[in-house]
Amino acid sequence: MKLSPREIEKLDLHNAGYLAQKRLARGLRLNYVETVALIATQILEFVRDGEKTVAQLMCIGRELLGRKQVLPAVPHLVESVQVEATFRDGTKLVTIHDLFACENGNLELALFGSFLPVPSLDKFTENEEDHRTPGEIICRSENLILNPRRNAIILRVVNKGDRPIQVGSHYHFIEVNPYLTFDRRKAYGMRLNIAAGNATRFEPGECKSVVLVSIGGNKVIRGGNNIADGPVNDSNCRAAMKAVVTRGFGHVEEENAREGVTGEDYSLTTVISREEYAHKYGPTTGDKIRLGDTDLFAEIEKDFAVYGDECVFGGGKVIRDGMGQSSGHPPEGSLDTVITNAVIIDYTGIIKADIGIKDGLIISTGKAGNPDIMNDVFPNMIIGANTEVIAGEGLIVTAGAIDCHVHFICPQLVYDAVTSGITTLVGGGTGPADGTRATTCTPAPNQMKLMLQSTDDMPLNFGFTGKGNSAKPDELHEIIRAGAMGLKLHEDWGTTPAAIDSCLTVADQYDIQVNIHTDTLNESGFVEHTIAAFKGRTIHTYHSEGAGGGHAPDIIKVCGEKNVLPSSTNPTRPYTHNTIDEHLDMLMVCHHLNKNIPEDVAFAESRIRAETIAAEDILHDKGAISIISSDSQAMGRIGEVISRTWQTADKMKSQRGPLQPGEDNDNFRIKRYVAKYTINPAIANGLSQYVGSVEAGKLADLVLWKPSFFGAKPEMVIKGGEVAYANMGDPNASIPTPEPVIMRPMFGAFGKAGSSHSIAFVSKAALDEGVKASYGLNKRVEAVKNVRKLTKRDMKLNDTLPQITVDPETYTVTADGEVLTCTAAKTVPLSRNYFLF
C-alpha cells in the first residue's frame, strides 16, 4: 500500500466520520467531534469522485447538516471545517464557512456513499435541553476610549503613488512611505489613533484625514525608514525633517491642523465598543466569560492592558520592529516568550494580562511590549527581537494541573494526563503489578530508580512515593534516600495505628508528606483511633469521602481536622445517577477482591454510600475538601481531573446557588475550585515554590484554553516555557488547521526538551545523596520541603473546618449541624458536547 503518514491520519478521520454517519442515520443529533468528522470525511469522498471544484465543495459542505442535526451547543463550537485532499490538479485546501445556516441539512448528501439509511427529518426534533452558549462573553454596555489623555492631531494625507499603501496602528507616521504626502513635522512622534493591530489604507490618489496620537513610554523612535531615529525632541525633529527633504519624502505643511487631547476633544477621540474590543483582544475588566458549557461565569477583575497599546502579533499588527517590539534590547533584557492578552484564571485572581516567560519561568504577569513607545510596560516584560509570541487573545490560561494521587500502572497514562492539562504527577507504582493496581507505592530502591529513569524524558514533573506501611521506622529510610518524595500508607498493606505512627515519625525527620488510605475494615480501630494515631501531625488523606477507601462509613470526618489535608478522587465527582452502579466492579478489580467470597463483596459494598458521596459534593463547595485528584486506573480517570472538578462546581451552583450573597459572577467559586487541582496539591506535597499557580518565579507550566472548550479539551500545554502539546492539524497541510486536528506532542516534548523543562521531585535526603548523577537523570531534580508544619489553614480558599458527624446506620452526614445532602445529577456539562466516546 505504501501509505504515507497523512493517509493513515485521514483513515482515522474517515473512521470518525463514518461513526458519525451511523449515529446520524439512527436519528442522533451530532456533537462537536462527530460534526467536524462527518463534514470533513464527506468532503474527502466528494473530492475522490473527481467531479467538484474547491468552490463547489465549499458550498456543498454548508448544506450537509442543519441546526436540528447537531446538538444545540455545536453551532457555537464549530467555527469552520478545513480539510486538504487530492484533486485532479493536486492537493488543495477546502474550507467550509458559515455552517448551520439552515434548520435542516441535506441528509442524502451527508450520508452519500455510506449505504446507510437516510433518516426522516422528523427524528430530529427540538427538546428541552439547556441551550447554553459555550464560552460566551457577556460585556458591559459602555464604550472604551483608546489612547486616552494623549496629544492628538488631525492631518490631511494624500497617496501620490500608483499603488495602495496600508499603515498599521503603531507604525511611526513620520516614517511611512515617501509617496504619502502630509505634514511630517507635525506627525513627528505620532502614530495613528486606531485600535491596536488595525490599519488605515490609502488607495492611489486618495486623500483622507487621519487622527494621530503621540507615542507613549520613553518616546523613542526606532526602525521604519530611519528618518527620525532616536528620542523625540526638538533637535532630533530638525534632523528628521532634514532627512525628509534630502531623501524626497512627501511633505507639505498644514497650518490649521486641529490639535488637542484625546478624551477631551471628541473629534480626536477613538472609541470602541466592549463587544468589538472583546472580539479583538478578549474581554476586559467587568466583562464575563462562560467556562465551557457550564453555568459558571468568570468576571475579569483587572486588565493590565493600556487601551490602544495592546500587543498583537501578525501581518501589519503591533509586535513589529520599533513598534510593539523594541529595538536594541539584548536577549538577557527581553522575554523569551510572551503570551499576549490572556485571561488568567488562578486562585490569586481572575485577570487579563500578558504573561512573560524567561528561562522556563514565569517572569511576570502584566503589560508587555516596547517601553520606548508604550505606557506602563513592566520593566522585565520587554518584547525584543529574541522574543517568541503566543497569541492569547480570546484564550484562558490556567496553571498546569497537579494530580497527586497517581497509580503508575502504565506509562500511557502520562499522555492522557498532559493532553488534558496536567503537568505534574505525584504518586507511586512500578507498572501493572497488583500492588500498583491497588496502591500508590514504589516500594524498593531499585524500583524508585527505575521510575525516575523511565520518566526522565517525559515532558512532565514527577514525584514518587514509597511504601510507608512499617511499624518499625528502620525500614523506611532507604526508600526515602533512594528518591521518594513522600510515603504512602495504604490499607492493602495494613494501615494500622502502629504503622501510621512509625511513618509520620520518619516523615517528620525528612520533611516529606505522608499520604494515607485508611482502614475500611475498621480492623485496628475506628476513624477516631486513626485520627488519634496522627497525634496532631500533618497528613494528607486520600479519597476522604470513602468510596475510594477508608474507614466505613465515617472517614469523611477527617475533613474537620486541622492537621489533615483532605483530598478526594474523581470517580465520585460529582455525584450523578450512575455513580453508585459503576463502583462495585471498579472496586473489586482494583483491590484484587473475589466476587465469590462474601467478605470481599461486603468489604466492597461498605465503601459505596450514596449519602457520603452526596455530602462530598457539598463539602467541596464549602471548601472543606481541599484537593481533587484522579486515583488513575485504580478507581479514577487521570484525563478527567479537570473536567470533573468543573462539573462538580457547576452542579453545586445549580443546586446551592451563589457562594457569596449578592454576587453576580462566580469568581469565588471558580477560584476555590481551580485551587483544588493547582496550588493546594502543590502546597500539600511541598512543590508550591516551583509549580501550582500563575505567579512570577514559578515554572511556566501553563494550559491555554478556548473558553468554549474550557475544562474539556485544552488548546495548548506549555511545559517549562515551551510548547509541549497542542492541537495541530494535518502535518502535510499548507496551514496548521486542516483536519484531523489532534492534540499532538510538539518540540517541547521531544528529545532532551522533555527533561530539560521539567522537574523530578525527591526528598532532600535523596538530593543530597546525589540521585541525579547516580541515576543519570537529565531532569532538573529538586527537593520537596515545608510540609511537616502545614495545617488545613494553609489550603488556599479550601480551609473550612466543619464539625462533621456520620450516622453509622443511615450514613446521614452533618456539618456543624447542617444535614449535607443533594440529589444526583442526571446530566453534567463538559461531556456529550465534546467527546466522541
From Swiss-Prot:
GO biological process terms, semicolon-separated: urea catabolic process
GO molecular function, one term: urease activity
Chain residues that bind Ni(2+) 1: H405, H407, K488, D631
Residues binding Ni(2+) 2, per UniProt: K488, H517, H543
GO CC annotations on file: urease complex
Residues with the N6-carboxylysine modification: K488
Modification note: Carboxylation allows a single lysine to coordinate two nickel ions.
Residues that span the membrane, as ranges: none
Cofactor: record remark: Binds 2 nickel ions per subunit.
Family: Belongs to the metallo-dependent hydrolases superfamily. Urease alpha subunit family.
Protein name listed in UniProt: Urease
